[in-house]
From Swiss-Prot:
This is Dephospho-CoA kinase. Its EC number is 2.7.1.24. Keywords: ATP-binding, Coenzyme A biosynthesis, Cytoplasm, Kinase, Nucleotide-binding, Transferase. The gene is coaE. InterPro entries: Depp_CoAkinase (IPR001977), P-loop_NTPase (IPR027417). It is found in: Cytoplasm. Pfam families: CoaE. Residues 10-207 form the DPCK domain. Coiled coil: none annotated. Its main location: cytoplasm.
Length: 207
């Protein structure tokens, strides 16, 4: 448990779509480690009533809103995939707000170390918040198969997402640790437990 006046030791956890980063994060959580998911923070900042949602609707038009007033993520995703400039505008708006949410939640961590789970850890600059970076990696064919199964997406849709995401080599270049998730869940769980004990050792060495 961290001391009230002590900054939490943060592990960054990232990986491409279909790599299994969420499954790995769940394994860490099952071991009692507090996790903050950047995707959840990204949803919080665009909830109805939040200023960011109003700015998005003003910029892209009411077509990105559902009848309930909530963000229509599918409509927005289509717009930003088709126009890189629009994606950059959206990132410039949301990334600082998301980072504020992340910092706030990480500060509340009570476990020996905390984990920031983010698919955009490297490209958003969020890696600067962490003391160590773990990349969950997987062969491209497995990423495609898993995502098609999970999201009922076509192969073309998944490949398009992979092209937009940061290049695998760039992600790996920032990594302190790499876990190649190409086996079953039991193996993944045992590898996470091994890393967990290693991180406890590192955390114990922090002043």
């Amino acid at each position: 448990m961290t001391h009230p006046d002590e900054k939490p030791w943060i592990l960054g956890l990232t990986g491409g779509i279909g790599s299994g980063k969420s499954a790995a994060a769940k394994c860490f959580s099952d071991l009692g480690i507090d996790t903050v998911d950047a995707d959840h923070a990204a949803r919080w900042v665009v909830e109805p009533g939040r200023p960011a949602l109003e700015q998005i609707a003003a910029h892209f038009g009411k077509g990105v809103l559902q009848t309930s007033g909530e963000l229509d993520r599918g409509a927005l995703r289509k717009l930003i995939f088709e126009t890189p400039e629009q994606r950059r505008w959206l990132e410039a708006l949301l990334h600082p707000l998301i980072n504020q949410e992340i910092v706030s939640h990480l500060a509340k961590a009570k476990s020996p170390y905390a984990i920031l789970v983010s698919p955009l850890l490297v490209e958003s600059g969020q890696y600067r918040m962490v003391q160590r970076l773990l990349v969950i990696d997987a062969p491209a064919h497995l990423q495609i198969e898993r995502t098609m199964l999970r999201d009922s997406s076509s192969q073309e849709q998944v490949e398009a997402i992979l092209k937009v995401q940061i290049q695998r080599e760039d992600r790996l270049r920032h990594a302190n640790d790499v876990l190649v998730n190409d086996r079953d869940h039991a193996w993944l769980s045992s590898e996470v437990e091994r890393l967990h004990h290693f991180y406890l050792t590192l955390r114990g060495g922090q002043s």
